[in-house]
Amino acid sequence: MLLYRDELAAWNERDDIRVHITVDAADDPEWRYNVGFVPTITQETAPSAKEAYAIVCGPPIMIKFTLPILSELGFPPERIIMSLEMRMKCGIGMCGRCNIGQEFVCKDGPVFTLEQLNKTPREY
């Protein structure tokens, strides 16, 4: 299931936005977008970092392997944006499961830049 289908289609029509929709494996024979791992697709498409932001949303392992590629492509840490909601459990800062150093993903995020993440303890 693809969420925000209309919004993604509208972005894809713009000249100033490049959208790469990707799944690991396509179960639908009519799937017309990228198939493969996001780090691989990122290397293959080699998006320009000039005046651009990279927005990364997915499982932690995908984020982990995509961030270094974006850095190699020249994206500065303040323009790499990621969603870390998979770390949340209670959603109100009580359980402590989502804390990264002094930050709580549920209260201070879940969207962070790589610049912000680089200031947290390395255990994440």
Model-derived regions, located:
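FNR/FR-type flavoprotein reductase catalytic core
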Residues: 1-89
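Generic secondary-structure boundary signal with a strong preference for alpha-helix termini
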Residues: 70, 103-105, 121
